[in-house]
Every structure is written in structure tokens, then in C-alpha cells.
Amino acid sequence: MFKITVFIYVLQLILPSKVHSSPVPDSDNGLREFPLSIVHINDFHARFEQTDELGGQCKPTAKCVGGYARLVTTVKKLKEEGQNTIFLNAADNYQGTLWYNLGKWNVTAYFMNLLPADAMTLGNHEFDDKIEGIVPFLEVIKTPIVVANIDDSLEPTFKGKYTKSVVLERGGRKIGIVGVIAQNTDNISSPGKLRFLDEIQSVKNESKRLREEEKVDIVIVLSHIGLDHDYDLAEQAGDYIDAIIGGHSHSFLWTGDNPPGKEKVVDAYPVEIVQTSGKKVLIVQASAFARYVGNITLYFGENNNLIRYAGAPVYLDSDVPEVPQIVEEMKAWEEFVHEKGNEIIAESRVVLSRENCRVSDCNIGNFFTDAYVHEYVTSHTGPYWTPVSVGLMNVGGIRASVDRGNITFSQLITMAPFENTVDTFDLSGKHLLEAFEHAVTVPNRLGFNGQNMLQVSGVKLVYDVTKCEGQRVVSAKIRCQKCDIPKYEPLDPEETYRIVTASFLANGGDGFTMIRDNKKNYKVGRKDYDVLINYAKYSSPITIGEEGRIRIIQ
């Protein structure tokens, strides 16, 4: 039976109906093609075990997909089937499940070393446990680490642990791999005294050096800056680069009908960007959470011009066999994780979904922010009904949906893995309004995507994102705190409001510097998972829905 399953899976990998291919106009007069197969993953986020189709914890009654054992099966098979294959990892291997909370860098390095990549860049989440949490990983990982835009002059422990690029040889040709990380990593993680340099200029400089000094034939950028920024990078990094293997934005790219999973298609696979010189640069990305492995073959002419390409992401559905060695290696870790993770916290009679969190209020966002407010209502002994009536949550901190049924400790950690504290502070209405404006100002060439959206409790917001930045809040109403009967009143820029939120946001994460720089009477609270556990038990069975707290005109 196993042999039959493997045979069917191999057929799925090579059937042309699932492969997108296209010619690229070529000025190369050579007749011989050089194929370069690139197998790639990104944003693994500690999904060692199989998940449900949305990347959350898989329950016995659900359809399970992905997981590291299937990922290894697929990567090995694609490497064997490809031509001059390279395997690239576009970062954010850290953070996302109880596996990481308990095993940290140790478990990540252990399993990544069972399937070393030819190159790996670093992502923002690799710095979530500060410099001390990444240096040990860099010291033991068997994969070359490439990042071109880090200045480590003030972090001596980081020196010598990575390079700007690496040169691989395949079929007699030299392939340069240049790494790049998001320039705002210091705003969204904890990288100590590292400085992050301009992404485009850093890639341009290193790619030029590779072409001129190392005499490489092909340059691939291994990027963890997000699809929007990859568009800009492809346009502006010069004709030194040929393709970008991306991550960070969890973008599912697909060409054609009938994508295999439940992911929303963001753009084509690959995206084609035409530079002003006429050169085409390709961009690929493979969603997130070990549900897909990217697979593309680039065909170059004798003069190293891109002629054509073929490929598509491979979906790791339940038909993909798991590598027995990996399954066996995981058992000891699973026992350790499951002992804590299988504890039942509460019951939910609704799906707690993050799907719409960037474009409206979502019920999981309502659950988070209501939990934050509830934390302080229950311990309050003073006048009025609460010491804090407004709860805020950055959507990037909500990491997974949860299906209806029992909620375990492991699922809750997967929802909120970052171990923030739930803190309170005073903020003027003026700066609160600035925060609401910042939540909808991130540009996106595919249309508004709410990258920095805030989920809220005790707030009613109407946005018009067709208006100019800084003028998009049409209406903002705040639930009163110092009142006998809670009601919503227009936000007053001169009023002072008591706010509760995660420490990440309170300290200016995601660019919310107006909160960091203007908060008063700051008090640190309990860990977020303790707050969420307490509220889940209080609310069980959970029935929260979408309540129209946020409305967006676009």
C-alpha cells in the first residue's frame, strides 16, 4: 500500500497539468538550455507536526496536511526529479507552536539539520528571543546563512555567523545566492544592537560584486522582506538579479484554476516583473506553515539569459507519505510537547478565524481584545465598571485559527505564541487616533491589505481607505470607562484613555511609535497566554462572532 501511495505521489509531482510554464523573450542566441531547479520553503513557523488546512493544530476528525515529515518527503523527491537542483529556505523557521515555546532554537536546529538547505536567510522571528536566542542556532546549523543588509558592528557575538551571499556550482555554472531581511526588523522583533540596512541597495551592491568579482553566471535573491517589497526589489535592484525566492508575507502564489488548498491566491506563480531595461525578474513564494513546497525550474541560455520557466507549488496533502525516519525522530519531542499541550482549556462552538482580521473585525480578534479588557475588569475594585475599556491587538500577533470543539493548551499557544505581557497605559485621544490611522497606511500595489490592522475591544471604527493617508478614519467611537452604563462616544483628541494591549504593541512594534513614545502610567501585566486561558475558561463554551466593530470602505 505504501508503494502505491508513493507511486501516485510521484505522478502528481511530474504531471504537466499542474505545472505552469512560460517562454521569456530571449536575446540569447545560444541553442543549449541550462536548467536550474529551485526547491524552496518559507515561514515554516515550527509546524513540525501536521496541521489542519489553515495551519492550525490538526484534530483527529479533521483533514491533516503538511508537517515536517511530509516536507522532507517532498523536498527529497523534488531534488531527485529536478535538474541542477538547489534547495533554499527563506526563513522564519522559529515561532508559531508549542514546539518552539518549549524547544526554542534547539529543536529548530535539530530538525533543520536533518535536511540541510543549500542556503537560508534569516527572518524577523529568528530574533524574537533576542540575540541570545539566535546565536546558538547559527553556531550549529549546517546550512549557510546569507543576509546582505545587516550591520553587526555593535553586536560582536553575531560577527562571523553568516555571510552576505554564497556561491553554488551546478552543471558548470556559478550561482550566487544573496540574502536579505526586512529593514524594519528592529521594529517588529528584538535584534539587540543590530542595524538593518536598505534592502534594495544592499542586494544591488552584493549582486554587483558577485557578478564582477566572483564572476557568477546567475544571481538568486533569498528574501524575507514580503511580496510587496519583493516587487520593488525586482524592479530596482538592477539587471544583476534573475529571481527572488521570497517569504515573510505568507503569500500563496498560483497560476491557473483549482488551487489545491484553502489558501487565497495572491498573485501568479511566478510573478514576472519587467525592469526598465526590459529584463524580466521572477518572484516566487510558497505560502507558510509547511503546507506547500515551492518548485520552479528556470531555463537559461548559453549567455545566461532566462529563456523560459516551469513549475508550481506542491501541496502537502494527506496523500503525501511521511518519511519514517523523521516520524521516529519526532516521537521523543512529541511526548514532551503533548504532555503539556493536550490539556483541554475550554470549548468553542464556533471557528475562531483569523481569515478576515486584516480587512474587518474578526471573531478571534474580538476574543483576544475582549480577553485583555476582561483581565482588568475582574480584578478591579475601584469606582466605575472598569479601569480600562479599550483593548487593542496587532493582527500579526494572531497566528492561527482554531476550529470548533475543545481548545487545548497547544492550540492556544499556536494562536498566540510570542509570550507577550498584557499591559496597560494612558494615551491621549490624539495619539490613539494616530494609531488608528497608522493601522491602515501600509501601501500595497495589489490593493489595501491591512498589514498593520488593529483588532479592537471597546472601539467602533469606520475607515475609508480611498482617502489620503492620515485622513482615513471616518468615525471613531470609544466605550466610556468612567460611567455607570457603558456606551460609545466620539473619540475626543483631548481626552486621556486607558488602553490594554500586548507588550509588543505597547513598545512600538509594527511601527506604532506614537504609542511607544506617548504612553503614560505604564503597567506590565501577566503573560498573554495566562490571560487568554483565563478568559477562555470564563467564556466556555465560546460563541463570539464578528460584531461590526470595524468597517472599511474601499
Curated annotation (Swiss-Prot):
Pfam families recorded: 5_nucleotid_C, Metallophos
UniProt cofactor(s): a divalent metal cation
InterPro entries recorded: 5'-Nucleotdase_C, 5'-Nucleotdase_C_sf, 5'-Nucleotdase_CS, 5_nucleotidase/apyrase, Calcineurin-like_PHP_ApaH, Metallo-depent_PP-like
GO cellular component: extracellular region; plasma membrane
Annotated AMP binding sites: R358, N394, R399, F418, F504, D510
UniProt EC number: 3.6.1.5
List of residues binding a divalent metal cation 2: D92, N124, H224, H248
SUPFAM superfamilies (UniProt xref): 5'-nucleotidase (syn. UDP-sugar hydrolase), C-terminal domain, Metallo-dependent phosphatases
Keywords assigned: Allergen, ATP-binding, Hemostasis impairing toxin, Hydrolase, Metal-binding, Nucleotide-binding, Platelet aggregation inhibiting toxin, Secreted, Signal, Toxin
Localization annotation: Secreted
Keyword flag Ion transport: no
CDD domains: MPP_CD73_N (cd07409)
A molecular-function term among this protein's GO annotations: apyrase activity
Reaction catalysis annotation: a ribonucleoside 5'-triphosphate + 2 H2O = a ribonucleoside 5'-phosphate + 2 phosphate + 2 H(+)
A Gene Ontology biological process term: AMP catabolic process
Cystine connections: none
Residues that, per the record, bind a divalent metal cation 1: D43, H45, D92
Tissue specificity note: Salivary gland (at protein level).
Task performed by this protein: Facilitates hematophagy by inhibiting ADP-dependent platelet aggregation in the host. Cleaves adenosine triphosphate (ATP) and adenosine diphosphate (ADP) to adenosine monophosphate (AMP) and inorganic phosphate. Shows potential for antithrombotic activity. Can induce basophil activation. May reduce probing time by facilitating the speed of locating blood.
Entry protein name: Apyrase
The organism of origin for this protein: Tabanus yao (Horsefly)
Gene (name only): APY
